Amino acid sequence: MADHRPPGRLMGVKNYLIDGVSGTGKTAVAEELQRRGYHVIHGDRELSYRGDPETGEPLDGLAEETVMDWPAWVHQHHIWDVDKVKSLVADQRHASSFFSGGARNFTRFIDLFDGVFILDVDLDTLNRRLAQKPEDEFGGRPAERALIARLHATKEDIPSCGVVIDANAPLAVVVDGILSKCGEAD
């Protein structure tokens, strides 16, 4: 993969982003990478907040009842802390770091990554996985599932520069495929 990072900037050895709509397996892939000893940042847990995707300004205190389409609003304002991403990418302590998750402000940091992988599944698999999510997790409610199905169909809000990975395959095969594309295969 080509190195699209800005020249002259101290970076971690190799940094990769694993993205895809909710239900495609980002968390499962990240956990398997961790199990295999790789450094993983769960971006949706460690870096995310509700904010303006253009400015990064936090949007706190907005009540659900004040927004017409709450799931779409939450999705559009799910962003990562760009300064934290930059700091983690610059960390030289790990040979490879895998960032897992999705953010609406990915255009502000995607060029920092050595590679971007987009997990994709067929609609039946997506619907089956979403049906297993608890209601307190994004994708666990019918309105959220409808939004995710639309995003799956349109591919909007997904980086277009990524390598698409068929995540219908067994987890070990998916992870082996990603590692092989990173030159990390055993």
Predicted features by range, described:
Residues 18:
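Hydrophobic anchor at the beta1->P-loop junction of P-loop NTPases
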Residues 21:
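P-loop (Walker A) phosphate-binding loop of NTP-binding proteins
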Residues 24:
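ATP-binding Walker
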Residues 27:
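Walker A/P-loop
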Residues 31-83:
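Conserved substrate/cofactor phosphate-moiety recognition/catalytic segment
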Residues 68-113, 120:
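Glycine-rich phosphate-binding loop used to anchor ATP phosphates in small-molecule kinases
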Residues 106, 132-186:
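Small-molecule kinase domains that catalyze NTP-dependent phosphoryl transfer to phosphate-bearing small molecules
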Residues 112-132:
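Conserved phosphate-donor/acceptor-positioning beta-strand/loop module used by diverse small-molecule
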